[in-house]
A protein has these predicted regions:
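Cytochrome P450 catalytic-domain helical core, especially the substrate-recognition surface
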Residues: 2-4, 9-71, 117-245, 454-457
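Conserved cytochrome P450 K-helix E-x-x-R motif and the immediately C-terminal K′/meander segment
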Residues: 59-74, 78, 310-350
């Protein structure tokens, strides 16, 4: 078998040599891809999840069919660069690590955001960093990096955040009793998000996340959008919090971050909100489910977590294996199923000339679970993340110039919640069934997840 050795002595599968020449898929394969990937992608919800369709597609493990089809596609055309004919024109699927690296390292200067993303996100967060280009992108990136402390291992308010997280986890466990699931995590992370971004005074402000959620549900319709009835009230509330920032909150840092009139500070905040509530709640719940279903991993985590110890922000930062568990949940079931880009100019990709206005697709649901490339594709491998902090195969937090500005903060929050939950008890995963000795499913319905709490004594 072709392969290479990792620093830990484990073998990483290497696929047979493939051409880097762009191939054109036939009409039948384009239709199959649309039915297997795009239809479920749209029905599940591009910006926030639809419970019914999440249930349907998790039931048939639809992403497993996507992975199998993409492997067949790559084998049939013997290429990592394949054109598909989809609605709106040709789309280029990029499978190779070198191709993905090139695209992400040249985003958004050459590879801007696709129309699907820009149109939908503009409905609830116009002028946001993630859909910006040119000088506006540079200005907004600098602002986001300053507030989110992107270049620091631990955020300057990390101790204050940790104290609040401990209090909220204790409060949540007091309320939920023996069994808990998605609704409990949703409430917990909304309260955490509100206090991290807006301060203690906002802890019970359910109106703000509710309005954002409604606008994100509307955005799932993408091209049938008018101005939301929630928009003005939502941004009015954000301006209120910005005008009177609370100590130890992200809004308290906003006035001191580099900005111009074009930064549009209020439009940067919704992205922080949904990333810290629905997205991070989903990933943290899945990570706890994985830990609970893998006894060896749980015991390794608990070696670093003494139930009688009240850990500090530095301790949380040192829990690298626990953070790896969170990263594995993100890898195994990426909440961002794909990264879609559009070439703003002509570009050369792996020796191929790519015309301007070409849609480019990086398919996380495939790249993260490609067993022909990754020896651990369908297993739980937190140790992988102990040495590899950036790998262009895995783009749940993106990579390159547009890597998530809040990556370190999001991982810190999720790890802190997991550490506090595990310090306070043990948990049995009741639903879904995850077997540590078998390949993990490609779909995970967070809405149906149930855990049983066994309190610490």
């Amino acid at each position: 078998m072709n392969g290479s050795m990792t620093s830990a002595g484990e073998q990483v599968n290497q696929p047979e040599s493939r051409a880097s020449v762009v191939r054109n898929a036939d009409a039948g394969d384009s239709i199959k891809f649309a039915l297997l990937h795009f239809l479920p992608y749209l029905l599940r919800g591009v910006f926030t999840r639809n419970r019914f369709w999440t249930f349907v597609f998790a039931g048939i493990d639809s992403d497993a069919h996507v992975v199998k089809f993409c492997q067949q596609l790559r084998s049939k055309y013997r290429s990592d660069l394949i054109y598909l004919s989809l609605v709106g024109g040709k789309s280029l699927l990029v499978f190779s690590e070198s191709g993905i690296r090139h695209v992400l390292d040249h985003s958004p200067s050459i590879y801007g955001d696709a129309d699907l993303k820009s149109k939908g996100m503009s409905h609830f967060q116009p002028n946001a960093l993630t859909i910006s280009q040119g000088e506006e992108w540079i200005e907004r990136r600098l602002f986001n990096e300053a507030v989110l402390n992107s270049h620091r291992g631990v955020h300057e308010y990390s101790e204050a955040f940790l104290g609040m997280i401990k209090s909220e986890v204790e409060r949540s466990l007091r309320q939920i009793g023996k069994h808990f699931g998605w609704e409990d995590f949703d409430r917990l992370f909304k309260r955490i998000m509100l206090q991290i971004i807006f301060g203690a005074a906002a802890e019970s402000d359910s109106e703000l996340p509710d309005r954002l959620h409604k606008m994100m549900l509307e955005s799932n319709w993408i091209f049938l959008l008018g101005k939301s009835r929630e928009f003005d009230a939502f941004y009015g509330k954000i301006r209120h919090y910005l005008a009177s920032p609370q100590p130890d909150s992200l809004t308290a840092l906003c006035p001191h971050a580099p900005q111009t009139d074009g930064t549009r500070v209020e439009n940067q905040i919704p992205h922080w909100m949904f990333a810290m509530m629905e997205t991070l709640a989903t990933n943290t719940l899945r990570a706890l489910a994985l830990i609970s279903a893998h006894p060896a991993a749980e015991e390794r985590v608990r070696l670093n977590i003494n139930k009688n110890q009240s850990f500090s922000a530095a301790d949380i930062h040192s829990f690298t294996y626990l953070e790896g568990c969170l990263q594995e949940a993100m890898r195994l079931w990426p909440t961002t199923a794909m990264l879609a880009r559009k070439t703003l100019t002509e570009d050369e990709l792996c020796g191929n000339l790519i015309p301007a206005k070409t849609q480019v697709i990086i398919l996380n649901t495939f790249n993260h679970r490609d067993a022909e490339t990754l020896y651990f594709a369908d297993s739980f491998k937190p140790e992988w993340w102990l040495e590899r902090k950036a790998d262009y195969h895995f783009n749940h937090l993106s990579n390159g110039t547009q890597v998530c500005a809040g990556k370190n903060l999001a991982l810190y929050i999720g790890t802190a919640v997991l550490a506090e939950l595990l310090r306070r008890g043990r948990y049995k995963l009741r639903r879904p069934v995850l077997n540590s000795s078998r390949p993990l499913p490609h779909s995970f319905n967070e809405f149906q997840t149930r855990l049983e709490r066994i309190p610490a004594f």
